[in-house]
C-alpha cells in the first residue's frame, strides 16, 4: 500500500507580484484542502491524494505544469473507472482531486513518471451521503443527477475573489436559502493585477489557492460550479494564442477543478471575439480528452452558444439574449438543454426574463448584481417553489394559449395515444385574459403572483377551454394548471421520462413558407451602414397571428460560424466585426416559428461591400 503524506500548503514568495488585496490572498493561501481520500472520503464530496516528489523527480515548476507527471485511475464499487491528473501546488507537491460517485470501497492505481510511485495501488472507503451527485444531460433537453433523479438547474453568478471568505460564504448560504443549485464564475481572469499565470506559464499559487477556497466552499454546500474557463481579457492577453500555449494551462485547470461537481462554460461572450470558434473547438475537444468525469460542456455567449453545436464538443446551450424570441425559436431547431443567463437587474424585467425563459423550456442563471435587490431574490424563491414541485424535466413549450406563454407536460407513455397533459404552466407578462385549450380532464388551477409568491386558488376545472382574467390589471401573473392526482400517480410509477421529447424538421420549402424576405434587397450588403430587414406575411391565418423571427449570418470563409444579426419582423441589422470581410459571401439565415410552434428556415446569399 502507498503511504501518503498529510496535505500541507507551501508558502509562495511571489505574492508581491499577484496581490492587489494582500489580506484576501494571504488568508486564501492557507485554505484547508478537502479531506484525504484515505481518511474520511464521502460520496459526492471532494477528497485529495497528496504526493511529495523527490528533487530528481520534479526538476522545475515549469515541468510540473507542462509535463504529465502523475495520473491516478479510480475504480468504484460498480467497477466504473475515472482517470484524474495531478496538479502542482507548490514546492514538490502534486495533488489529485477526486469526488467519489458511489459509497463503498474504491481502488486506485498510479501512473507516474516517478518510478517510485508508478504502478502503486491502494484502496479507500467512501461513506454514503444523501446528496444527489453530479449533473448530466437527460431527456434530450433536461438534466438529472448521478442518483438518476431530475435536476433543477438554477444558477447564481459569483464574484469569486471580490468578497472576503466570510462574506462569500454568507452569500452562498443566502443562495442556498433562495433555492439555487449552481454557482457560476470565471476561473482565469485577465483583469487587474491578479493574474492566474505568469508570462512563462507558471501558475500563481496564491491566485489558485484563493480560488480553491471559494470553489471548495461551493462544493461543501453541494452546489454545482459552472466554470467559465477564461474571460475576454485573459483570452485577449494571448495566453491561448496557439494550441501549444493553451494545452498546459487547460490541463492545469482541469486537473485542479475537473475532479469536482462542475460544468464547463468556455470563454466569456465568445460571440464578441474573432477567432473564438476555433479556440473553443480546440478547448472543447481537449476537455473531452482531459475530463475524467465528462462534465457538461458549452460556452458563455452574448447571444447564444448554439452556433457551436456542429463542432462536436458541446452538449448544452448557454443563451443570454433579453429577447425571448431567440430561445423560443432556437428550441425548435436544437436538441440540447438550454440555460438562459438573465441580463437585467431591474425587478420587472428580471421577472419577465425568469418566466419567459421557463416557458421556452429553459433553465436559469442569474447575475450577481440582480441578487443584490431583495425583490429579485424573492422572485427567485417564488419561481423555485413552483417549478421544483412541477415535472420540470419534461417541460416543453405549449402553444394552444393566448394572452400568455406556456409550457406543459404530456404524460403519455405511448406517443400514438391521445394527448394526456399532466400540467400546464402559463405566464402572462401583461395583465389581461389568459385562454388555454387543454384535453378535457379535472385540473386544479391557481394564480401565482411572481413578485410576492401570493397564491390565489381557483375552482377545479373540467372544461377544455379555460379562460380567466388576471387577478389585477397592474402586474404579470402565472396561471398554473396541474392535475395533482395524475402528478402523484406518475411520481409513484413512471420512469424519469414518460414520453420521447418532440423533435421537428424545419420547413425549408419556400412554397410552404407563410412569409417572404422583402429586405435586404438585391445581392449586396454594406459593411458601413445598418441594413434594413423586413418580412412580409404571404398567408394570414390563425397560425401566423404570432410569428417569431431570428436572423443569423455566416461568412463560411471566416470560419467563425453563425452570428446573431437581428430579431423580429423588421428593423436594421449590422454585420459583426468577426464576419466583416469585404468581398466575403454572407449567408443570411432566417429562422422562424409560427403560433403553433411550426419551424421555418429561409437562406439568402449576399456579397459584403465596403
Regions found by a protein language model. Give the residues of each.
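Surface-exposed, flexible coil segments in extracellular/virion-facing regions
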Residues: 554-575
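Active-site mouth of glycoside hydrolases
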Residues: 67-69, 129-324
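Short, solvent-exposed loop/linker segments at the N-terminal edge
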Residues: 39-44, 62-64, 523-530
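Catalytic-core region of carbohydrate-active enzymes that cleave or remodel glycosidic bonds
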Residues: 294, 309-375
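Solvent-exposed loop segments of extracellular immunoglobulin-like
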Residues: 541-550
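Extended acidic/polar, glycine-enriched regions
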Residues: 82-140
Amino acid at each position: 500500500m502507498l503511504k501518503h503524506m498529510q496535505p500541507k500548503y507551501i508558502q509562495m514568495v511571489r505574492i508581491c507580484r499577484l496581490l492587489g488585496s494582500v489580506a484576501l490572498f494571504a488568508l486564501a493561501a492557507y485554505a484547508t484542502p478537502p479531506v484525504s481520500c484515505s481518511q474520511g472520503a464521502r460520496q459526492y464530496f471532494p477528497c485529495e491524494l497528496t504526493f511529495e516528489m523527490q528533487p530528481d523527480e520534479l526538476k522545475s515548476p515549469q515541468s510540473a505544469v507542462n509535463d504529465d507527471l502523475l495520473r491516478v485511475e479510480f475504480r468504484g464499487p460498480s467497477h466504473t473507472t475515472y482517470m484524474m491528473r495531478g496538479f502542482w501546488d507548490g514546492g514538490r507537491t502534486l495533488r489529485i482531486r477526486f469526488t467519489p460517485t458511489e459509497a463503498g470501497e474504491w481502488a486506485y492505481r498510479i501512473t507516474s513518471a516517478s518510478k517510485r510511485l508508478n504502478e502503486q495501488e491502494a484502496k479507500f472507503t467512501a461513506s454514503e451521503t444523501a446528496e444527489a451527485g453530479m449533473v448530466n444531460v437527460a431527456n434530450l433537453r433536461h438534466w438529472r443527477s448521478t442518483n438518476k433523479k431530475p435536476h433543477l438547474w438554477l444558477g447564481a453568478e459569483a464574484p469569486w475573489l471580490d468578497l472576503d471568505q466570510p462574506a462569500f460564504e454568507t452569500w452562498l448560504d443566502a443562495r442556498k436559502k433562495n433555492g439555487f443549485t449552481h454557482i457560476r464564475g470565471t476561473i482565469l481572469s485577465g483583469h487587474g493585477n491578479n493574474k492566474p499565470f505568469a508570462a512563462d506559464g507558471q501558475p500563481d499559487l496564491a491566485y489558485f489557492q484563493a480560488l480553491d477556497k471559494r470553489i471548495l466552499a461551493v462544493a461543501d454546500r453541494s452546489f454545482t460550479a459552472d466554470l467559465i474557463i477564461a474571460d475576454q481579457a485573459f483570452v485577449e492577453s494571448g495566453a491561448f494564442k496557439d494550441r501549444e500555449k493553451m494545452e498546459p494551462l487547460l490541463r492545469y485547470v482541469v486537473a485542479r477543478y475537473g475532479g469536482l461537481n462542475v460544468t464547463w462554460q468556455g470563454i466569456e461572450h465568445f460571440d464578441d471575439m474573432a477567432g473564438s470558434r476555433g479556440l473553443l473547438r480546440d478547448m472543447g475537444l481537449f476537455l473531452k480528452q482531459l475530463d475524467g468525469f465528462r462534465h457538461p460542456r458549452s460556452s458563455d455567449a452574448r447571444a447564444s452558444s448554439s452556433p457551436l453545436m456542429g463542432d462536436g464538443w458541446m452538449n448544452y446551450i448557454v443563451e443570454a439574449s433579453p429577447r425571448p424570441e431567440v430561445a423560443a425559436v432556437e428550441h425548435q431547431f436544437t436538441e440540447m438543454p438550454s440555460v438562459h443567463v438573465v441580463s437585467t437587474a431591474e425587478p420587472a424585467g428580471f421577472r419577465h426574463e425568469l418566466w419567459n425563459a421557463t416557458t421556452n423550456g429553459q433553465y436559469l442563471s442569474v447575475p450577481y448584481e440582480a441578487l443584490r435587490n431583495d425583490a429579485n431574490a424573492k422572485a427567485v424563491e417564488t419561481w423555485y417553489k413552483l417549478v421544483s414541485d412541477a415535472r420540470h424535466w419534461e417541460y416543453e413549450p405549449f402553444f394552444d394559449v393566448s394572452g400568455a406563454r406556456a409550457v406543459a407536460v404530456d404524460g403519455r407513455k405511448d406517443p400514438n395515444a391521445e394527448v394526456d397533459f399532466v400540467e400546464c404552466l402559463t405566464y402572462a407578462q401583461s395583465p389581461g385574459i389568459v385562454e388555454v385549450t387543454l384535453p378535457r380532464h379535472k385540473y386544479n388551477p391557481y394564480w401565482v403572483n411572481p413578485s410576492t409568491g401570493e397564491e390565489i386558488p381557483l375552482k377545479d376545472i373540467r372544461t377544455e377551454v379555460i379562460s380567466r382574467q388576471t387577478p389585477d390589471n397592474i402586474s404579470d401573473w402565472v396561471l398554473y394548471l396541474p392535475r395533482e392526482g395524475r402528478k402523484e400517480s406518475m411520481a409513484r410509477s413512471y420512469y424519469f421520462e414518460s414520453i420521447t421529447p418532440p423533435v421537428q424538421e424545419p420547413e425549408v420549402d419556400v412554397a410552404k413558407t407563410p412569409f417572404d424576405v422583402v429586405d435586404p434587397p438585391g445581392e449586396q450588403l454594406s459593411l458601413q451602414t445598418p441594413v434594413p430587414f423586413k418580412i412580409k406575411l404571404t398567408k394570414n391565418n390563425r397560425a401566423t397571428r404570432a410569428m417569431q423571427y431570428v436572423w443569423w449570418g455566416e461568412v463560411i470563409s471566416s470560419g467563425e460560424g453563425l452570428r446573431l444579426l437581428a430579431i423580429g419582423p423588421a428593423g436594421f441589422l449590422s454585420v459583426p466585426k468577426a464576419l466583416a470581410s469585404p468581398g466575403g459571401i454572407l449567408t443570411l439565415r432566417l429562422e422562424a416559428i409560427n403560433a403553433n410552434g411550426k419551424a421555418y428556415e429561409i437562406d439568402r446569399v449576399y456579397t459584403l461591400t465596403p
